[in-house]
């Protein structure tokens, strides 16, 4: 069993924010795989596709760890069964990167997960939302909606990200990393 957590902020106000690309990913994955309807729990919303649970925390981004530890306990999975999908301002828009483990890179949602589950040993799929213009505060940038051009890139990246997770689940992490870590979407 695998749990794929897409990070974002709950509510329609944030739906197309750069910070919500993790939510966009699980929505796309659900659509492609024809998963069950969303079910609501105390700290998260989930959908099931066979032995895969798609999860959206109902907490705000910086408290994502609360939702992840709750779903980890509810679904009886280890941290190695968790894949976290989130935005990365240090990665250009149009790129994705898979990592087996690592630090938070300053991402507060990811840091919250590390703090709550007590380890950084879980797979993560980073989706690029950068570069951030120098004259904009980071918090303001990630909470802005994607531009039309960025949305066209993100639309294609999300398809590739679904493919990447499919390869990861069926052919292994190493194969997915070798195929998709150098991939770049161009318009």
From Swiss-Prot:
Listed EC numbers: 3.1.1.29
Catalytic activity: an N-acyl-L-alpha-aminoacyl-tRNA + H2O = an N-acyl-L-amino acid + a tRNA + H(+)
CDD domains cross-referenced by the UniProt entry: PTH
Site (Discriminates between blocked and unblocked aminoacyl-tRNA): 9
Record keywords: Cytoplasm, Hydrolase, RNA-binding, tRNA-binding
Residues binding tRNA: 14, 60, 62
Enzyme class: hydrolase
Site description Stabilizes the basic form of H active site to accept a proton, residues in chain: 87
Gene Ontology MF term list: peptidyl-tRNA hydrolase activity; tRNA binding
The organism's place on the tree of life at top rank: Bacteria
Assembly and oligomerization: Monomer.
Function recorded in the entry: Hydrolyzes ribosome-free peptidyl-tRNAs (with 1 or more amino acids incorporated), which drop off the ribosome during protein synthesis, or as a result of ribosome stalling. Catalyzes the release of premature peptidyl moieties from peptidyl-tRNA molecules trapped in stalled 50S ribosomal subunits, and thus maintains levels of free tRNAs and 50S ribosomes.
Protein name (record): Peptidyl-tRNA hydrolase
Protein's organism: Pseudothermotoga lettingae (strain ATCC BAA-301 / DSM 14385 / NBRC 107922 / TMO) (Thermotoga lettingae)
Taxonomy of the source species: Bacteria, Thermotogati, Thermotogota, Thermotogae, Thermotogales
Gene: pth
